């Protein structure tokens, strides 16, 4: 069995500078640019997650216990459909047409060779312990989807939906970019088709496994940046000889928060230096 104590990322600092190229329960909201026939769906806050416009990544760590053992998973990511009625917390500007039934489709996946990106359905509180669908790296025209509207497609129904207990995982360490699209599954449009047209594809970056994103050297300190899921404590360790097996903690521990964070070693010796991040705990 793998042990989380051996999971770390490594960076080497020689003479000079060497660099390797908060949201909790994160929500991405789906709605529409209009409510007439063929008006386009969209992700209302998608700009904050667009991998082409930002370096932001949703961090995932290898789970060593619980339902997702053996897979990389981060904090919960929830896709929600904006409400159109008062009982569901609406009307919210940008909601889809009444009678639409929204789903999020996984269209494309890039990432490490042999890897895959999977969706786990939930019961409202936690995932059900089985992969609902898995999309391999290299996919460019995926059709798998998860329903996000809490209706049955009846005419006039509120498109609202907010499901908890769902999870997304990666099967191998590395950086993934997953293309998501909102589609309308209803048959309440012209000719028995959907009301709304599909959204543009939103590319979202996931980082499976701890990774030092940047390293900066100053006169009296070295600072590294990284991302980690909430409730995971991380420590920066260093050694002057990688073959010695002697790693000493030099900064932290620091609990993750899904956002870019920093750990700093002050007054490091002016010699070759090796760094790694190590997580101190794991979650189910």
Regions found by a protein language model. Give the residues of each.
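Short, hydrophobic beta-strand segments
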Residues: 166-171, 265-267
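Hydrophobic residues positioned within well-ordered beta-strands of beta-sheet architectures
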Residues: 166, 178, 202-204, 224, ...
